[in-house]
UniProtKB/Swiss-Prot annotation:
GO terms for molecular function: chromatin binding; DNA binding; histone binding; zinc ion binding. Its main location: nucleus. Signal peptide: none annotated. One of its GO terms (cellular component) is PRC1 complex. PROSITE patterns: SAM_DOMAIN, ZF_FCS. It comes from the Eukaryota. GO terms for biological process: negative regulation of DNA-templated transcription. Residues 485-498, 661-675 have a biased composition (Basic and acidic residues). The gene is phc2. It comes from Danio rerio. It is found in: Nucleus. Keywords: Developmental protein, DNA-binding, Metal-binding, Nucleus, Zinc, Zinc-finger. This is Polyhomeotic-like protein 2. The lineage of its organism: Eukaryota, Metazoa, Chordata, Craniata, Vertebrata.
Amino acid sequence: MEKEQEQGSVASSASVTIPSTTSVSTSTSAGTLSNSSSRQQTVPQISVYGGITDRQTVQVIQQALNRQPSTVAAQYLQQMYAAQQQHLMLQTAALQQQHLSLAAVQQASIVAGRQSCSQHGSTSQQTVASQTTINLATSPAARHLISRAQSGSSVPVCIGQQAVLLGNSSTPTLTASQAQMYLRAQMAQQTNLVQVARSLGRAVPLSSQLIFTPTASVTAIQPEAPAPSINTPPTSGQVQNLALRSQQGALTSTLSQSQLQSLSVKQSVASVTGQSVARLKGLGAEPSPQGTAAKASPAETSSETTAKNDKTSDLTTSVCPSVTSVAGHPFISTAYTQIQTHQLLQQHKQQFVIQQQPQILQRGQAQLLEAAAIHPHTVQAVAIQSALPAQPQQCPIPLLPKVPVTCQQATIFHSTTVSQQALAQNGQAHILTHTKAPPLQLTAVKCQIHPVQIQQGVASQNVPDKDTPVLLEPQLLSIPIQEPTRTELRQSDKESQVKENTQGSVNVKAGVGSPPAMTSGSGNNAPTVTGSAPQNGESKPPPQAVVKPQILTHVIEGFVIQEGAEPFPVERPSLLIENLKQKQHHAYSDLQKHNADSEMEDLSLQELNNQPEPVRTCEFCGNVDFAFNFKRSKRFCSTVCAKRYNVGCTKRMGLFPGKSSPEDTKKPKASDESPKNCSTETRKRNPSIQTTTGASLLSPHPSHPSHGESSQCSDMSSYEEPISPLSNSSFGAPIEHEESFDHSRELTPLLTQHFLASDPTKWNVEDVYEFICSLPGCHEIAEEFRSQEIDGQALMLLKEDHLMSTMNIKLGPALKIFARISMLKDS
């Protein structure tokens, strides 16, 4: 009756909602198996949340047949790997596009599973066409591992087997018939991936995967000829390679060659033959005294889970190597096993070899192989090999650590140790021998597993308990096959003692696209991980795992952007350093030049300071003052003097040609006489000279404006005012004007040499340009006269409208220029 209830509960499709945002949806149909020989208890009825003491539970149940992977986990998975530019989106998209073919494959697998459900208590070997599916309740916390298998005839693909590490707290012993079918845990899921990949036109061989639970004993079973093994706590002297050495009397369980999932194993020195279940039954065992009820009748009992606290049962028990995600990131389930055609294993079939060493009874060791997730670039092939001693009650089972996961994926350590009795000829596997409290830190593409102390309560018979860290023995595919021909275990003891101290903590930078490439030498070299692999000394105790800050790396439009919770150390690249050195060198040289220049400037300033401050005299009032107090042309001490002077000059146009030269301006400054006093007499005496020289003086030498000195008339124009009656009274008393007049007559031939013609109508374009430049504030406008090709005659014809409209000159400069032109005409 219990069997029927279990079968009914399993055959129905169910969906499991995992509290830690990890959702795994598959479809399954399984028949329950009862133990017919070793125990009378049946597997408790499966309920999704019945008796859940800890919600960090994963139950892998197949869901609706045509359901697309449209869950939040799958969508986030696609987005994450798209951002990280992994090669994972192809298969995820393929799963979505080919969900109809998935449904067909799943339907076929369910039909095959239902046909095999009738074999409830059967422990006989299953043929290829009928492989039973099982359900498993491994703890009262309702952690259920529901797996299914499918007949090889329904899906003509070669798929590797599944090795399942089963176990939890307070669960009765598992029969060999159950354990035999645990191995087929993910056959249908892998087949789905193969169907999808082949529908895309790819030949995709799938390697096997390892499903483990952290509180379980090890079960390594062949699908057809199950040979169980008890995982014993390996000590430093008993660390074996991935393929256990079994030169004498090694027993290898293989399938018949007619099966699609046959195991082709290299033959060792001892004859390796397919063993039946009946032969394996002779290796019965008593329960271990450490509380590990390891009923090791291999055909009947594979392993018994050890009694532990429920705290260690937080890790997921599922057919997909997924771990509950605390950080809310989905992990890679087997349904989303990413198939990389360029990095898949070259063999379709992975062999799970279980070998015995009856002649080494005390040192029988079981190698615990853990693969927490599937690497993004390779489908991991992992198997369990155990040396099953004749006295299995003396080989207690190690307890696996509770690994709380903060991410979607745990690291698969890339390694292959291929030997004669290797589990796979090209399989990639990794040895993680857990003993007492090694700090373990597994990281994957965007994850980081925080280390947890491994609770190990059992020890080997001969070797006392030691603190031995995780053994990591990766082998590259390029390394030649190492055949374990050593018969002395002490050599391996020495190597293992070296290797045990090499694994401290493994922390791979998250987000790096390349998988962690682990390389290892001949065995004494410490394995290296591309991210970081802190190595411990041989004599030092293993330190606590260093939890490094998680750094996310993004590639956005060609720019590598790293994102971390802590500030990055300031490290300048060599190129920047060189540039900085060059800049500093240039700056230093420039500073030296600047210093030299500043020294020269200082010298010149000192020379100038040594010179007396220039003193000016107002041309109107005769006030003597420093030059900086004089404004504009430095001729007048104030604007009042300038205005009064200009009013006087307006009356007598172009009177003294000598006033335009700087030498001439200084002499009348010496006396209080005003040059305007002699205006009347000058006009009377020399009317002809006034017209010629006055006109010529209106265009002084071009160097005069640079001295700040301009002609009389230029100053007049800047201060032009209507003549007021006060202007006449503003002039001082007449003084001897003969002197200044004679001086002006002396300068007349000098000034006429500088100009081409005294008649404005004879000026050319350059003369007009110089004339306009001499006007204050009209230097920029002079260029416009040159561009318009205005010569002397055109200048005489210019009017205000021409200046303002045609030449686009502002009103102020236009009035000044026109006033000057009028003066020239009048003169």
